[in-house]
């Protein structure tokens, strides 16, 4: 009879530990799923912050946490409202000064990147100085060409 009690305690501990693991895993998946269909609460639509259209062909509808400007990350959503890219806008001046950019994009941690594009931009509303767009795409290049017009 003493042998049964330790087994039951072990079983109960295993069940509780499994439940905690599943809860944490489910919450992590829910948070990740949420960012795929809508940005975090601290992110604002870029078109409400600067004079830009709601949808930018080739980039999508962009959202950014204003505290992270000018670098971002900017979250880009396609016309159907799906997250398709994460963009950083890195000013040339800061690169020339050898500034370190650390822990960028923790809001997007765990996303599966398909490919990365790096493109020069001479400046636009919101980031007027010359900078590079570092775009981490979550969709293939072919999908990018097709969906982001």
Give residue ranges: language-model regions.
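Bacterial N-terminal signal peptides that target proteins for export
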Residues: 2-15
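Bacterial N-terminal signal peptides
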Residues: 13-24
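Metal-centered catalytic cores of metalloenzymes
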Residues: 30-149
